Amino acid sequence: MARVRTNTKLKPSKKADLQVVKPVKTTRYSDIDLNNWRAYDHVKTDTLWEFPTRLKEGGHSNEYHGNYIPQIAQQLYERFTKKNDVVLDLFFGSGTSGIEAINMGRRCIGVELKDELAESVSQKFTPKQLVTDVRIICADSASEEMREKVQASLDIMRE
């Protein structure tokens, strides 16, 4: 079960006059206010996520067979990460997870088995992002070598 912390900042409800003001309540892994979660219109809260179209802006394209729609990453990152957190994608592919991480103020470590795909996806990021916010590791996701490279990348990103 996730531990919950309560911020001391108070956030008024929609009817601020004479209404009870609840403290902002978040978890250690998300900035979503648990006392006000229904007010997040951009976060899908039902069990079926329907998106009218696939996002194509912000660096996304549909050139790789193993990709998924960026809105899935958006929904997951909104719920389970905070700004500046590091997202680990062990099957980086076309970089959808990394692009969305950057677009949402997160950082990303992507592991990709194919050299040519890792090189191609690195072109989607700026040289500065590849130093500070995105690490692309070419390795087998099940290997000890990958674990060591991910740990080294995490150490660098924490500095």
What are the language-model segments listed below?
Residues 2-159:
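Class I S-adenosyl-L-methionine-dependent methyltransferase catalytic core
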